């Protein structure tokens, strides 16, 4: 939402057709840049930073000030942003807007590589979120997510976002005569 509001404010003087096209393009860019909830949080975080919001940690004691803008990230997959009003919440209330950023798909399991017949590699995956399986068959698929790599301590690996935005794999459908 902040993403779209930002461009409405900047471009509202240029006419509604321009605004509509710009908003549509910005939304598509956001979707392409955010193939997972982790990527969406990173994209929203960058937008919030550009618009004067400050990150606060869930575990810290909060010292909120009127009219200040804040956000909190949880598990790198959820983000909550808010602006503190200058009136008493008991009198004026509270307004919240929420969005869901994860989607059905397949998650790669730890120890993902499965060699089949010594000729090709299969990924060991699990379904997430109840996808409609038939829509995934016989189409090129990319790979995106969060990976853990060796860090300074074995107990604290570093994480990186990965988005290999090109066709890498396919889930083949069963032959028509076998279905």
Tell me what each language-model feature is.
Residues 2-179:
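N-terminal hydrophobic/helix-forming segments and targeting peptides
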């Amino acid at each position: 939402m902040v993403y779209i509001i930002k461009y409405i404010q900047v471009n509202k003087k240029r006419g509604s057709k321009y605004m509509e096209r710009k908003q549509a393009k910005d939304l598509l860019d956001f979707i392409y840049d955010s193939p997972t909830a982790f990527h969406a949080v990173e994209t929203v975080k960058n937008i919030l930073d550009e618009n004067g919001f400050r990150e606060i940690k869930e575990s810290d004691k909060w010292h909120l000030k009127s009219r200040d803008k804040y956000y909190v990230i949880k598990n790198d997959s959820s983000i909550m942003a808010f602006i503190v009003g200058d009136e008493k919440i008991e009198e004026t209330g509270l307004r919240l807007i929420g969005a869901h950023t994860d989607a059905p798909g397949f998650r790669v399991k730890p120890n993902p590589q499965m060699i089949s017949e010594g000729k090709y590699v299969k990924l060991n995956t699990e379904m997430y979120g109840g996808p409609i399986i038939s829509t995934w068959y016989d189409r090129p698929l990319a790979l995106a997510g969060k990976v853990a790599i060796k860090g300074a301590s074995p107990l604290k690996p570093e994480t990186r976002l990965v988005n290999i935005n090109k066709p890498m794999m396919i889930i083949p459908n069963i032959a028509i005569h076998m279905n």
